[in-house]
Amino acid sequence: MLRLVLDTNVVLDLFHWANTDAVPIMTALEGGQVECLADERTLDELQRVLTYPQLKLTPEMAVDRYRRYSCLVRIYPEGEAPPLPRCKDRDDQKFLELAARCAANILVTKDKALLRLRGRTTLGFRILNPAAASALLPPFTLQETP
């Protein structure tokens, strides 16, 4: 099973904007075909971003989006990350560190600073935008119930 780390903007694509590039990720996540990992720092950032006025969310809507996401992810414990390249945007370093610590296969992001690091062979995981990550997902199959 693929293990994914989603940056905050991709989470917003899934749970707020319904971006078409991210729909296959949402389908795979809801269908249990991928494992999505988060930690306290990434969840804290999401909680903070959901209060931004430009999203035009009521407090109830923000809580709902946070709850829906946090119910679908596995919370990974905090810990020491291996040596990693430095992301130009220091706020995004936490996503690199989480992907390395949890042995993710893919860090899914639209952030240019993170995407610039994708050619690094020492990472141990791929850094892809939502469309490229979606192309790697297994085809969705409905589970039949007896």
PLM feature spans:
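Hydrophobic/aromatic ligand-binding patch that stacks against planar heteroaromatic rings
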Residues: A28, L98, L117-G119
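Short secondary-structure boundary segments
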Residues: T8, E40, K110-K112
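Conserved glycosyltransferase catalytic-site signature
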Residues: T8, D89-Q93
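PIN/NYN-family metal-dependent endoribonuclease catalytic core
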Residues: V5-L6, A22-T51
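Membrane interface segments of multi-pass transport proteins and intramembrane proteases
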Residues: L55-K56
